[in-house]
Amino acid sequence: MAPRSRRRRHKKPPSSVAPIIMAPTTIVTPVPLTPSKPGPSIDTLGFFSLDDNVPGLSQLILQKLNMKSYEEYKLVVDGGTPVSGFGFRCPQEMFQRMEDTFRFCAHCRALPSGLSDSKVLRHCKRCRNVYYCGPECQKSDWPAHRRVCQELRLVAVDRLMEWLLVTGDFVLPSGPWPWPPEAVQDWDSWFSMKGLHLDATLDAVLVSHAVTTLWASVGRPRPDPDVLQGSLKRLLTDVLSRPLTLGLGLRALGIDVRRTGGSTVHVVGASHVETFLTRPGDYDELGYMFPGHLGLRVVMVGVDVATGFSQSTSTSPLEPGTIQLSAHRGLYHDFWEEQVETGQTHHPDLVAAFHPGFHSSPDLMEAWLPTLLLLRDYKIPTLITVYSHQELVSSLQILVELDTHITAFGSNPFMSLKPEQVYSSPNKQPVYCSAYYIMFLGSSCQLDNRQLEEKVDGGI
């Protein structure tokens, strides 16, 4: 167990609770806005790291969003009212300003403000995603860009189509699985199960007024229907990857979801992105993965949890078939002391961390260490996902050094199929959310460093 003084370093006062019911099968409760959040924020670190590759990029983003500081940006993201003139007069202005945040030379990293009067940033005509300040930079950059140009074309389309999720014009198709759950092992079998019904649903979205308005507002030609349908499918996998990956963990770790009173999953280090667009029905798919379950609680814990998402500390039994979403702002080891140890919330059957990033920063590793030790010492079944094979290797090495008992790792059959562009390094190979997973349970890892290297090098 982590030393108590270390684990209590980031204490914060408990928040108030106001439970409500948002849907017949999904219970959700709003979390009040808190003025400050403890510990390092991966969202904040990520924002300011943009300047490492493109000096001044963070300020360009704030400028295009009509904001004066990152604090004001976070205030708006957290549901507050900005002090300056944030907002857009029309959709065309919004999309243009969003696109302007990507305008810098991919080769020399020049921003618009640093160009001479004779130069202007123009995008690659193939992917419409990467900009150059002139033919010389574009020609010099082509050997690097050609490897990712096609994928970045998909990124550019997805970035616009994702707006349909924000507005609610693309509602994820859902319903009980017509196939036995054990027959659905990956996206191929999931899409086969959904079949023509899913295609009809996506086609209805494509002919909607919302899609017509979207592409009329962005100032570029509308792609072909098959391109747009492919984008909707990628967006669908991006949203459903998290609940289905949780299901993968419950399956692989042999957790009984038919226990009286329901089962509990804690999502640790939950980010703003994970919670901001999450809607009550998004986790229904997790329930359909386990027909006959007696209730599933999904509690998201993190310093960047979206304001207004949810918070609940109820220990009441769930109704069979119910999925309860809730959240808590703060670090997990503090949440454990304040909520779990005091009996205010349920002990987890599974803990999951999507892209914890503890391998990437000493500050993040320091914040994660008490939680990782807690999970190890309490022998809590734990699932971690990462973006890439490189992150997998680095994370495995850290977990081995912490003497965790790694039970499984590999490629995630329910990874997101939506490519993610590295914002400030656009020609870096795009990554995919939850591309790989690691599972561990307790201590005394059975793989030493040499065995681990052999397993990783042998292919996953």
Swiss-Prot record:
It comes from the Eukaryota. InterPro entries: Mito_gene_expr_regulator, Mss51-like_C, Znf_MYND. Keywords: Metal-binding, Zinc, Zinc-finger. Zn(2+) 1 binds at C105, C108, C133, C137. A zinc finger (MYND-type) spans 105-149. SUPFAM superfamilies: HIT/MYND zinc finger-like. Gene3D superfamilies: 6.10.140.2220. GO terms for molecular function: zinc ion binding. Pfam families: MSS51_C (PF20179), zf-MYND (PF01753). Signal peptide: none annotated. Zn(2+) 2 binds at C124, C127, H145, C149. The keyword ATP-binding does not apply. PANTHER family: PROTEIN MSS51 HOMOLOG, MITOCHONDRIAL-RELATED, PTHR46920. This is Putative protein MSS51 homolog, mitochondrial. It comes from Homo sapiens (Human). The gene is MSS51.
